[in-house]
């Protein structure tokens, strides 16, 4: 239990909600959040290094070129969640991610296009029960991404992605991270 709490705290204190503009890191968060569908976040955090190794340290160009042989190899690899649909979707999503980069100049710019003021939203919640699972921005972005062919990226996963990458600041009012983000 302590190691789990330690891993969560380190992620919360050092990464979660920290503004990300780098497309490689955004792709990493997209992959990890998608992998989490139906699972606990701690499961994915524990396997994060495995995901980095399995998916070329989130080099989107290399991931997009992965083959059926790579998929079969990953189905035997304990470093990630061995779910064929999720592995396939990671490769598919990489190809679509690249298409968005070409269309918008970067995935960061694409993501920001769903925010009317072109900047992060800072919410002022006092309790966890106030934090929503989705938002109008996550609804619109996930709808657009699904239309483009992305898999495992519904509005709830999209909202978690937006939180993780700092597009939505949902640190509670009494959280020390609130002031530094």
Describe every region a protein language model picked out.
Residues 26-43:
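Short, aromatic/basic-rich helix-turn unit that serves as a nucleic-acid recognition element
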Residues 31-35, 52, 72-75, 91, ...:
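Amphipathic alpha-helical segments within well-ordered protein domains
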Residues 41, 45-54, 86-94:
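Non-catalytic DNA-binding core/recognition domains of DNA-processing enzymes
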Residues 57-134:
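Alpha-helical ds-nucleic-acid-binding substructure associated with the helix-hairpin-helix region
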Residues 111-132, 136-181:
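Catalytic DNA-binding helix-loop module of base-excision-repair DNA glycosylases/AP lyases
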